């Protein structure tokens, strides 16, 4: 690979790193071609890009981004990067599920919305709610509040009418 090709790769990886909300470093040594293909398929289904890139090129690309240099600590051995653009948690869920069934895939580090997560924190990451799940929860909460408002207003009106009727009866008596 000549200097120009390396420069293009560095620029491309830097763009991906900047666009991604979640960047995950994995070690894949020992995985067969079919296992890597299966893993890539799972990532593609969630619109996650999974690329094998040389550590030195990733390190140089990181220098062109706002991602913490601490992520470079995970650049040892073979490295593949998962770029989560829309949902920063989705890659963690896939990596966790896949590595539970195949110990050859190892989670190294991640940067999720600027926060660095280390190897031992994959469970914590994978248990977080995804963006879609959070939106669903918020929408459900808002819906519950909105649907409760008419009942509350009706109860207040009913109590007011009842109180006015009692006052009218007392004055009539």
From Swiss-Prot:
Forms part of the ribosomal stalk, playing a central role in the interaction of the ribosome with GTP-bound translation factors. PANTHER family: 39S RIBOSOMAL PROTEIN L10, MITOCHONDRIAL. One of its GO terms (molecular function) is structural constituent of ribosome. GO terms for biological process: translation. GO terms for cellular component: large ribosomal subunit. The lineage of its organism: Bacteria, Pseudomonadati, Chlorobiota, Chlorobiia, Chlorobiales. Pfam families: Ribosomal_L10. Transmembrane segments: none annotated. PROSITE patterns: RIBOSOMAL_L10. This is Large ribosomal subunit protein uL10. Keywords: Ribonucleoprotein, Ribosomal protein, RNA-binding, rRNA-binding. SUPFAM superfamilies: Ribosomal protein L10-like (SSF160369). Belongs to the universal ribosomal protein uL10 family. It comes from Chloroherpeton thalassium (strain ATCC 35110 / GB-78). NCBIfam families: PRK00099.1-1 (NF000955).
């Amino acid at each position: 690979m000549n200097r120009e090709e390396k420069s293009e790769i560095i620029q491309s990886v830097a763009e991906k790193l900047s666009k991604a909300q979640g960047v995950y470093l994995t070690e894949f040594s020992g995985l067969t071609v079919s296992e890597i293909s299966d893993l890539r398929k799972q990532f593609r289904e969630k619109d996650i890009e999974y690329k094998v890139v040389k550590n030195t090129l990733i390190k140089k690309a990181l220098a062109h981004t706002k991602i913490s240099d601490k992520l470079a600590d995970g650049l040892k051995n073979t490295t593949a990067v998962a770029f989560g653009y829309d949902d920063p948690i989705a890659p963690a869920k896939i990596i966790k599920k896949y590595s539970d069934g195949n110990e050859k895939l190892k989670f190294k580090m991640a940067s999720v919305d600027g926060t660095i997560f280390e190897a031992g924190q994959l469970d914590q990451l994978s248990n977080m709610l995804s963006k879609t799940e959070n939106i669903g929860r918020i929408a459900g909460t808002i819906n519950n509040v909105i649907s409760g408002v008419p009942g509350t207003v009706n109860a207040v009106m009913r109590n007011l009418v009842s109180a006015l009727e009692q006052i009218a009866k007392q004055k009539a008596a």
